[in-house]
Amino acid sequence: MRKILILLLVLFISVQTISSQNITTPFEQSKGTQTPTYFEIIDWWKKMDEQSGKVIMLTMGMTDAGYPLHLIVVSNNGDHNFDNIRKNNKRIILINNGIHPGEPDGIDASMLLVRDIVANKYKIADNVVLAIIPVYNIGGCLNRSANYRVDQNGPEEFGFRGNSQNLDLNRDFIKSDSKDARAFVEIFHLTGPDVFVDNHVSNGADYQHVMTLLTTQHNKLGGEMGEYLDKEFEPALYSSMKQKGFDLIPYVNHFGDKPENGWPEYWDSPRYASGYAALWHTFAFVPETHMLKPYDQRVKATYALMQSLIEFTAKNSEAIKKLREQTKQSVKTATEFPISWSLDRSRSKEVLYKGYESSRKPSEVSGLPRLYYDRSKPFEKTIPIFNYFPVKASVKKPVAYIIPQGWWKVIELLKLNKVQMTALKKDTVIEVEAYKIEDYKTSLRQYEMHHLNSEVKIAASVQKVTFRKGDWYIPMNQVANRFLTETLEPQAEDSYFAWNYFDAILGQKEGYSAYAFEDIAADYLKNNTDLKTKLEQRRLTDTAFAKDGRAQLNFVYQHSLWFEPAYMRYPVYRVIK
């Protein structure tokens, strides 16, 4: 009986393998010139789910396009329960494709990779599980044309960068204006990836490299994980890719005519996929193929890089696990967190850059000099990459944050990100550190539906504040500590304050009629000699103020008991003892 069961199992696996070998992709059918439509992508993955026990297709959250995200789970034993996967000591690699559907290389490379896995043409180790989003920006994928990305070499047709709200989803991970981003956050916390990959295509200079790599900034990732990323993980990928026939180069973050002079490493703040992943102590990578290379070369390079990531993760599974576990524990007890970094141009690493000589020639459009790269003049040169970003500013960790329940949009995002918090059970007075926004700058041009606040200056003071039943108490003893710091501290680059979630405090809601307040102000000054002294001193030191009656009246109002306390008071409070 046992022999019969084994024979049946072998026959079942053989049938699956033969069947999967017969599944070709639109990319292959077109000989590397086409990428599938959204519906072809989903139908293809459904067939893989049906024909292989290694592949499970899950339906996840809804997007702005009216279609749900899907998640493909690939494992040798067919397990798609992520709690079990973690208990069984397996590393999880989350691969995101089609965030910019005009850059579909990862869509096709992932299909080829998984088809080869189930056909036993490429074997993944038992200690690795792949979680793949087949296409993230569904709205952009549906908006298909041959005319977008005029300077990209294939495929024949592809999707659009913006989603159904015309948002760039690779700027939406913190602010989460889209349903797409919210569905992604659910996937991210479901999978809890050890390694995250977000497949892209680059723009910018012309050079010989097919694949460039944007690695999450190692100083920002920080600690032993950052050191391991910089000294072990990333160099191993470069070595592996060279063995596979591809010379990697850091993402070419240069938009002049001489990239051979070097460039600063791309700064991936938390608005970006890789920066968001770093907040959760995940090794994050953004492969960027070169737009001018033929499509089939770009897909093959993406395939090879995903193989390299899988192979390193499998080989170094225990080291990755240990580093992440140690980091998660240390972040719970850390006493301060960085909120800004600055580029150090005195430090760099050297890489071999394979470029083309650039020059100027008359433009046939304007007649003026224009840049061009001469592919008949390739060169190789060792160049500097400025990849050190030391901490510029840090904040001491509070015992907890408290957010009044009225700021429910922020509360929703914290809950979405699995932040641990409790609602106050009764009205209570708590001594807290409160911030007042002293100054800030707002961008004049809109950026992804927002006018970003920056250069924020604050004044902190200890106050007793009355909180109501239902306000939210957020303890700072959790894995989410870094996420909380970089979203709730107003001076952080991608804080919720920066993204305008608290802009209502920046405008006064009450005022006065000058003629009516004049007599009230005069009486108030008679009874408040300290304020009268301050007013007189201001007149002596500020000539324009001394000549402006309205400004002086407003000075009295702003320093009186009638001035609204909510104006410029940041509504996220810090419990400090």
List PLM regions with ranges.
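Bacterial Sec-dependent N-terminal signal peptides
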Residues: 1-24
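Second-shell loop/turn segments in exported
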Residues: 28-35, 99-103, 170-174, 223-227, ...
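Active-site/substrate-binding loop(s) of hydrolase catalytic cores
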Residues: 86-99, 104-258, 265-268
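Hard-cation-handling environments
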Residues: 254-432, 436-437
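Feature captures C-terminal
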Residues: 362-499, 503-522
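Accessory, solvent-exposed terminal regions and/or long lumenal/extracellular loops of proteins
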Residues: 480-482, 491-577
